[in-house]
């Protein structure tokens, strides 16, 4: 097996070892990708996706706290693909900084699904920046991403690293969907784009816990999600649409503004990429085709947000779904998503769409796995932007092409 040598506390003959720090270039490290959190619901789906898509064609590993649970996942991977007997198993704990340093130093790209990221993400980012390792995650937490930019962008940029958050349904379909749309438009003209989301799927315990924790500090989350107002070179303008809830006759649907991290990510990409034009505006909406569903969703979200403000009711909500649980394979198989973009410049109007299967887990695991593979294998095709970057800035068209080959559709309507 392609495992790391035992560190302190490791026993000869074990498949699970503690990672040892290495000073060699990342391509000479034991692994090209490590999946941290592989025993969780989404992390396991990521590992299973890699087992099916790459097998042992490149060296990769799974990592987490529990040796026993990691061994269980490893056996499942071997059952999917016997080549995965070569997949490494590494013990690491987000609460143990030395173990994270050893883990980050063992791989070219560290993929983490361990959330909530506001609680567990920053130590992993720190280890990656200090050890010279690229990083991807699936967070949708604005405060965490903003803090990552503030604390580590310059250090990561100085080392030529790509620290890329939001590599799942938050926010790849939106961020790369807008990039794909912009590339269909003439250069040098003002651009206005609306993104309209529809989806069907389930909820995992990890996502539920992250959402409740975000609702508990809603003011900070909303503040972190506001786009930057710093002036851009050359007088470029990047702005959020001010359109509120409205009925769209062309789509026969209500368009409800979505206060998620996605528009913040899109606008950050627009600020960093001149190709988005001299004056860029973006609006982000949920597309709801039933008034009853719209009202029911609004009441439900408001109720959960209110209950999240108080410790007793917050703990009750957290107990509804345990971490590590999630929708069944049958539910995931029936899920789907579409994000439709309506774009206009002075000389052209188009509609595009990104679509795929169940968004929260089936496609999220695919998206983040392909993001890690893109960083590990496509470096000669990546945009020049480094630091704490978005998927559009850090991977761009190379990742769009990977996702298309993996079955996620990007198309002009």
What are these regions (language model features)?
Residues 3-5, 9-10, 15, 24, ...:
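Short, low-complexity intrinsically disordered segments enriched in A/P/G/S/L with frequent Arg
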Residues 23-25, 183-413:
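C-terminal catalytic/substrate-binding lobe primarily of soluble NAD(P)-dependent oxidoreductases
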Residues 32, 108-109, 134, 350:
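Structural motif
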Residues 55-69:
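Conserved glycine-rich Rossmann-like NAD(P)H-binding loop of the short-chain dehydrogenase/reductase
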Residues 80-95:
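Rossmann-fold cofactor-recognition segment
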Residues 91-106, 113-116:
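Conserved Rossmann-fold cofactor-binding substructure of NAD(P)-dependent oxidoreductases
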Residues 116-225, 261, 268:
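Glycine-/Pro-rich loop/turn segments that contact NAD(P) or position catalytic residues
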């Amino acid at each position: 097996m392609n495992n790391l040598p035992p560190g302190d506390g490791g026993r000869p003959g074990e498949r699970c070892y503690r990672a040892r720090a290495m000073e060699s270039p990342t391509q000479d490290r034991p692994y090209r990708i490590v999946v941290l959190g592989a025993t969780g619901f989404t992390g396991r789906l990521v590992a299973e996706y890699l087992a099916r898509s790459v097998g042992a064609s490149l060296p990769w590993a799974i990592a987490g706290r529990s040796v026993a649970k990691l061994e269980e996942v490893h056996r499942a991977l071997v059952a999917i693909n016997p080549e995965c007997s070569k997949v490494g198993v590494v013990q690491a704990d987000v609460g143990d900084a030395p173990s994270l340093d050893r883990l980050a130093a063992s791989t070219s790209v560290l993929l983490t699904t361990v959330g909530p990221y506001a609680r567990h993400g920053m130590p992993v980012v720190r280890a990656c920046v200090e050890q010279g390792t690229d990083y991807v995650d699936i967070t949708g937490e604005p405060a965490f991403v903003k803090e990552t930019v503030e604390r580590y962008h310059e250090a990561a940029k100085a080392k030529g690293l790509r620290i890329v958050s939001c590599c799942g349904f938050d926010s790849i379909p939106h961020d790369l969907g807008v990039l794909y749309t912009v590339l269909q438009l003439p250069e040098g003209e003002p651009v206005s784009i609306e993104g309209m989301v529809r989806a069907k799927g389930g909820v995992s315990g990890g996502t539920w816990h992250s959402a409740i924790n975000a609702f508990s500090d809603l003011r900070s989350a909303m503040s972190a999600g506001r786009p930057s107002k710093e002036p851009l070179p050359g007088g470029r303008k990047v702005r959020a649409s001010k359109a509120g809830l409205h009925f769209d006759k062309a789509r026969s649907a209500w368009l409800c503004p979505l206060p998620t991290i996605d528009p913040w990510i899109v606008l950050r990409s627009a600020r960093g990429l001149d190709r988005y034009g001299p004056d860029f505006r973006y609006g982000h909406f949920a597309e709801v085709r039933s008034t009853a569903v719209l009202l029911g969703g609004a009441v439900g979200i408001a109720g959960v947000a209110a209950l999240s403000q108080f410790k007793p009711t917050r703990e009750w909500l957290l107990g509804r779904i345990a971490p590590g649980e999630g929708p069944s394979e049958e539910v995931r198989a029936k899920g789907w998503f579409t994000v439709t973009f309506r774009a206009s410049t002075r000389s052209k109007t188009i509609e595009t769409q990104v679509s795929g299967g169940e968004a929260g887990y089936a496609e999220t695991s695919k998206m983040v796995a392909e993001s890690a593979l893109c960083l590990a294998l496509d470096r000669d095709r990546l945009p020049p932007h480094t630091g704490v970057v978005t998927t559009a800035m850090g991977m761009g068209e190379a990742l769009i092409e990977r996702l298309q080959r993996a079955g996620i559709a990007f198309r002009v309507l």
